[in-house]
């Protein structure tokens, strides 16, 4: 029996009681694996969450999609996009836009998720791709930012590459859900990219990621074994081929 699809209210009731699991998914195969494994939350691109097979393979995964403020230039753009995504099967909208945009969406009852700490689309303002809130002053500023997101109506924020003690204290002080990517176990969810877990990352693997399998290496090994089998004649074998009766074969040869 398929598990029931979780709601924002369900996730909120688990705050402080259970660490949720969260993945960035980009394919139907990853979505099916996440559903089978019992993953709680997924961040998925728009083209995946709107795929006609997505909810068939991941019916119970709470699924967030979104665009950055660089892609949605106005609050109305975000609202229009959010409506399309929720109608297609998304459960929440990621928004890296302003607090005014967050508030605008929340007033229209859109379940909206913000982003604090290292935010790739805004990294130039925090010194590039590096940790945030490593000083008392910057940690206080981060807390104030999270509180502002809560006041604006966001139900959650991704909190990325922040010292764990800072993230844990913010989580204690606020009702806002904190989804941790490199911010420690004191948050409400642990968030990794599927490609990092599966060993399929191109280039640098972030420090906060953990590689559980080496699919990239295994894929190359499988292809190399196929190449060697073809060269040696080990492939194809009889079980890979269609049989023909001897009588029909002889008739063909004599024809």
PLM regions with names:
Residues 1-255:
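Alpha/beta enzyme core
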């Amino acid at each position: 029996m398929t598990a029931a699809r979780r709601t924002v209210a369900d996730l909120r009731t688990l705050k402080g009681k259970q660490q949720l699991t969260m993945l960035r998914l980009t394919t139907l195969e990853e979505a099916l694996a996440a559903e089978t494994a019992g993953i709680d939350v997924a961040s998925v691109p728009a083209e995946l969450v709107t795929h006609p097979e997505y909810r068939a393979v991941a019916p119970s995964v709470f699924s967030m999609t979104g665009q950055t403020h660089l892609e949605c230039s106005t609050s109305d753009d975000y609202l229009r996009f959010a409506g399309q995504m929720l109608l297609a099967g998304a459960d929440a909208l990621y928004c890296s836009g302003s607090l005014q945009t967050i508030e605008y969406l929340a007033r229209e009852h859109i379940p909206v998720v913000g982003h604090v700490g290292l935010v790739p689309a805004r990294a130039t303002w925090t010194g590039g791709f590096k940790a945030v809130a490593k000083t008392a002053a910057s940690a206080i500023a981060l807390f104030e930012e999270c509180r502002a997101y809560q006041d604006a109506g966001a139900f959650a924020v991704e909190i990325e590459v922040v010292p764990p003690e800072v993230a844990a204290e913010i989580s204690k002080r606020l009702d806002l859900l904190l989804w941790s990517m490199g911010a420690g176990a004191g948050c409400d969810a642990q968030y990794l990219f599927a490609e990092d877990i599966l060993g399929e990352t191109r280039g640098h693997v972030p420090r906060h990621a953990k590689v559980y399998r080496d699919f990239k290496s295994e894929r190359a090994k499988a292809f190399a074994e196929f190449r060697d089998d073809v060269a040696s004649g080990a492939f194809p074998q009889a079980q890979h081929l269609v049989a023909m009766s001897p009588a029909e074969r002889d008739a063909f040869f004599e024809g």
